[in-house]
């Protein structure tokens, strides 16, 4: 990579979602409410799964890990965004920006791959129910969670090192509400061809492979459900997979909209709105999606409420 002699920036200024002062306090209240709901929803779901013996199954093991990732995912972005609504100059140090980008990439990648692991779990449950507890043994479940986390940490670390080894001297104003990759690359005075090639190769492999696992798993699941003779069995199978299908559709749909649209139609304001959806809204929605459509979770919650009363 060709470097240009210049003064390296020591901090970045985040433009944020809006520069209109009259909107900042209402947005602060809105996003604070969403974040509190996200924290309570995800940590509450983890606590519920850990304390109820009936939820001690592979499906809920994966769900508790997804809830943990959603909590961390949102916590990397939202607190800084809330601070940006309160301060006139929204600065973030060079090292803090690197840490935020690295953590964001790690948790986003982990969520993407965890959804694929959960799709495989649903495939085994529907297509091979008699062998479910054998195939999805505790050791296999741990591997299906550990592998996404290990891969995501390595990818995020390498990705972040590549990004912050570049020289930033054109400007230090990031047109976003957090340290994201593409807005940062617009500020560099280094050759970014290798970096961009790495982004597309790594993101393409991860996205296509995880999406392929989800797609193939659900093709087998739908085929198995359609072959069921009992209407009650089909309804139970669909209810088992419905929450995950909805979560997958929302998450991957947002990523496809965000990253696979033509570069000519890429607008920063559109990127910001899509980023708000998958960094703030999705972590809030997932506990609702998995709880409201899940009979066992609702029964466990009712049991806790009754015991307290």
Curated annotation (Swiss-Prot):
It is a multi-pass membrane protein. Glycans are attached at residue 5. Disulfide bonds join 97-179. One of its GO terms (molecular function) is G protein-coupled receptor activity. The keyword Transmembrane helix applies. It comes from the Eukaryota. Pfam families: 7tm_4 (PF13853). Odorant receptor. Its main location: membrane. SUPFAM superfamilies: Family A G protein-coupled receptor-like. Keywords: Cell membrane, Disulfide bond, G-protein coupled receptor, Glycoprotein, Membrane, Olfaction, Receptor, Sensory transduction, Transducer, Transmembrane, Transmembrane helix. Residues 50-56, 119-143, 226-239, 294-309 are cytoplasmic. It is found in: Cell membrane. This is Olfactory receptor 8U9. InterPro entries: GPCR_Rhodpsn, GPCR_Rhodpsn_7TM, Olfact_rcpt. Belongs to the G-protein coupled receptor 1 family. Gene3D superfamilies: Rhodopsin 7-helix transmembrane proteins. GO terms for cellular component: plasma membrane. The chain crosses the membrane at residues 29-49, 57-77, 98-118, 144-164, 205-225, 240-260, 273-293. The keyword Nucleotide-binding does not apply. Residues 1-28, 78-97, 165-204, 261-272 are extracellular.
């Amino acid at each position: 990579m060709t470097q240009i002699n210049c003064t390296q920036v020591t901090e970045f200024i985040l433009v944020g979602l809006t520069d209109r002062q009259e909107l900042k306090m209402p947005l602060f209240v809105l996003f604070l409410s969403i974040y509190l709901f996200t924290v309570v929803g995800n940590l509450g779901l983890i606590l519920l799964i850990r304390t109820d013996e009936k939820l001690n199954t592979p499906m809920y093991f994966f769900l508790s890990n997804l809830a943990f990732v959603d909590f961390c995912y949102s916590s990397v972005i939202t607190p800084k965004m809330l601070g940006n609504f309160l301060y006139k100059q929204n600065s973030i140090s060079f090292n803090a920006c690197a840490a935020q980008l690295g953590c964001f990439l790690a948790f986003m990648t982990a969520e993407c791959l965890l959804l694929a692991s959960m799709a495989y779990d649903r495939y085994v449950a529907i297509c091979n129910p008699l062998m479910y507890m054998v195939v999805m043994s505790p050791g296999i479940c741990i591997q299906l969670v550990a592998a996404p986390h290990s891969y995501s940490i390595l990818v995020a670390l390498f990705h972040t090192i590549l990004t912050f080894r570049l020289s930033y001297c054109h400007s230090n104003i990031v047109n976003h509400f957090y340290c994201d990759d593409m807005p940062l690359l617009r500020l560099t005075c280094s050759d970014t061809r290798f970096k961009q090639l790495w982004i597309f190769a790594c993101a393409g492999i991860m996205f296509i492979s995880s999406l392929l696992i989800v797609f193939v798993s659900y093709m087998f699941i739908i085929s198995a459900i359609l072959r069921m003779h009992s209407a009650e069995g089909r309804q139970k199978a669909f209810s088992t997979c419905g929450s995950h299908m909805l979560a997958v559709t929302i998450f991957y749909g947002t990523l496809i909209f965000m990253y696979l649209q033509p570069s000519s139609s890429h607008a920063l304001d559109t990127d910001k709105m899509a980023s708000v959806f998958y960094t703030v809204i999705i972590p809030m929605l997932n506990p609702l999606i998995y709880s409201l459509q899940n009979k066992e979770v609702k029964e466990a919650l009712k049991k806790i409420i009754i015991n307290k009363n």
